[in-house]
Design a protein with these regions (language model features):
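N-terminal positively charged helical leader segments and presequences
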Residues: 1-69, 73, 228-236
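Acidic/glycine-rich phosphate/pyrophosphate-binding loops and surrounding catalytic core
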Residues: 68-69, 73, 77-85
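Glycine- and other small-residue-rich loops at beta-strand/loop junctions that grip anionic moieties
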Residues: 2, 28, 94-95, 119-120, ...
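Structured adenosyl-cofactor binding patch, chiefly the S-adenosyl-L-methionine
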Residues: 75, 108-114, 122-139, 186-231, ...
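Short, hydrophobic beta-strand segments that form beta-sheet elements in well-ordered domains
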Residues: 28-30, 46-52, 75-77, 143-145, ...
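Active-site/ligand-binding-proximal alpha/beta "capping" segment
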Residues: 155-204, 208
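RNA substrate-binding interface of SAM-dependent RNA methyltransferases
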Residues: 80-162
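Amphipathic alpha-helical repeat scaffolds
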Residues: 32, 97-105, 206-212
Length: 236
């Protein structure tokens, strides 16, 4: 039973709340039974698993938690054990710095069977806020670098693109979204094959990046599941 604040396992958890240590050690920390269960169900084994009242004094575990309500379980995992690879649809994110939005987009990618590619400048998907927003999807969704995503690149822009439902696509698709404040820079847009916009009827200037990405993924999934929509989307 861990009963000292100076215990090395507790010190490790504290360190891993800092991105610099996560990057240096190649580890991440999850808080709460739901996230730990998501890791287990995905076949990702913990390096350390601390359980309040079983192998650590509850008050000490609470002290190293970032949550307002202390979790019963805190786990440490290897980043290298997270899924990698490609899927037919990839959500490529350019400098999406808000961890809540990033985690939500990873969760949406999980729901619609997509992968996620991240540029430099994105929030850390293994940070505490992003992990909570992803609801454990981080253990199921393959991640890649922004330039590693393969397929026809479609930039999702607020205005001026082809209406998303009218876009003609076939094969692998990379849906490219920009940062919350600045969107996509010209050099990224220049590397895209198409520009698409989500039709809006209301006066809102634009959609939140997590909402826009989710709608884009839904539209692509809808086409993939509908034979008639799939036929109409193929290029002649």
């Amino acid at each position: 039973m861990i009963a000292s604040r100076d215990n090395e396992r507790l010190k490790l958890v504290r360190k891993l709340h800092d991105r610099r240590w996560r990057d240096k050690l190649g580890l991440l920390v999850v808080e709460g039974e739901d996230l730990a269960e998501s890791a287990r169900d995905a076949g990702v084994e913990p390096v350390e698993l601390l359980v309040a009242g079983e192998n650590v004094v509850p008050e000490l575990l609470a002290e190293v938690s970032t949550l307002a309500h202390p979790p019963r379980v805190v786990g440490v995992y290897r980043r290298a054990d997270l899924p990698r690879g490609a899927r037919p649809v990839t959500l490529a994110l350019w400098r999406v710095a808000d961890p809540g939005n990033l985690g939500t987009l990873i969760r949406s990618a999980d729901a619609f069977g997509a992968g996620v590619a991240l540029s430099a400048g994105c929030a850390d998907p293994t940070g505490p806020k992003a992990l909570r927003a992803s609801m454990g999807a981080i253990f199921r969704v393959p991640l890649a670098g922004f330039d590693e995503a393969q397929g026809r690149r479609v930039a999702l822009v607020p205005h001026g693109g082809t209406p998303l439902p009218e876009l003609r696509l076939a094969g692998e698709v990379v849906l490219v979204l920009g940062s919350e404040r600045d969107g996509l820079p010209e050099e990224v847009l220049a590397g895209c094959d198409e520009r698409a916009s989500i039709p809006q009827r209301g006066p809102a200037e634009s959609l939140n990046v997590a909402m826009a990405g989710t709608i884009g993924l839904y539209e692509l999934a809808r086409r993939a599941s509908s034979p008639s929509a799939r036929r109409s989307s193929l290029r002649s």
